[in-house]
Amino acid sequence: AYAWREWNAAHNSMPHVQSGASAARTPSSYPKADIRKTDTYLTMGLDWDHNKIEFLYRLKKQIGFRINCVAYDIIPVLFPHFYSEGADQFFAHYFSNMAWIADHIFCISECTRKDLKKLLVELGTPVPEMSVVRLGDVLPEIRDQHHSEQVKQVAKERFILMVSTIEIRKNHHILYKAYVRLLEQGYTDLPTLVFVGMPGWRVDDFMFTIRQDKRVSNKIVVLNRVTDADLALLYQSCAFTVYPSLYEGWGLPVAESLAYGKFCLTSNTGSIPEIAGDLLHYIDPWDVVGWAENIKKYAADTQALEHKLQEIGQRYKTTSWHETASSILKQL
């Protein structure tokens, strides 16, 4: 369904961009670009909803400069049921277009590189040269140390942290089920489970459930619109973090957790195992019992948790965003 038109032997035109953005500005209305043949145009991946790719293709044909792109993941194509109807086709067209114009694609994980290469082969497009760059995980130093009263109250007690937009793919629901299971079994001395993130799409029923379920009313807290200072305090103060995502192109909250020296219970899917290997504890994202048992274990067994924290401190190497930028610039 996503197969693209065959490459024109004469290279006279690029396949038409088939997206909802096609009614946007026409190429003739763009500001005149001073691009030379020796230049490299780098797009960081925020062009998927703009009508610029065909324009870039024609400009590249005319001038001969290089185009490098960044690919984060192809999750809407792989798992269309996580998104609105038509998102899979929209993104398949975007990646197809990217393949026609790119000389090089930077992927944020080996998982993304393999997923994208497989997709492009299936689409019948060119497969540009690809390389993997590691994303930064060091949050900037926070000068303003003002914290909200709600966050300060949360940080006073023992808690487990999950940082992510609240959406189906991030799988907050499995943690809710794990907590209910433990509470029903009589394990009432559990740390508070703190969700940090804005509600996304298709989670209204879930948000209603955790608000109305009296079993978790004092055990699950949702924080949103937190400041950088608040987020830093939460990372620093939590017992450990959890991240049961169903699929990732990288998994930045996992890396940020490790950068703060915090252990993470995480799912074993997508790119996540690339982040830190055996420093993490992996659980099937659908395994309610597995999540419940391991949350209970690391919440109660301070010695096991301390061993993990020591390993992270000794072995995890953080990556600055400057290092990420430098690794890209060196390959341009």
Please describe what each predicted stretch is.
Residues A1-L332:
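Carbohydrate transferase catalytic cores enriched for Leloir-type hexosyltransferases
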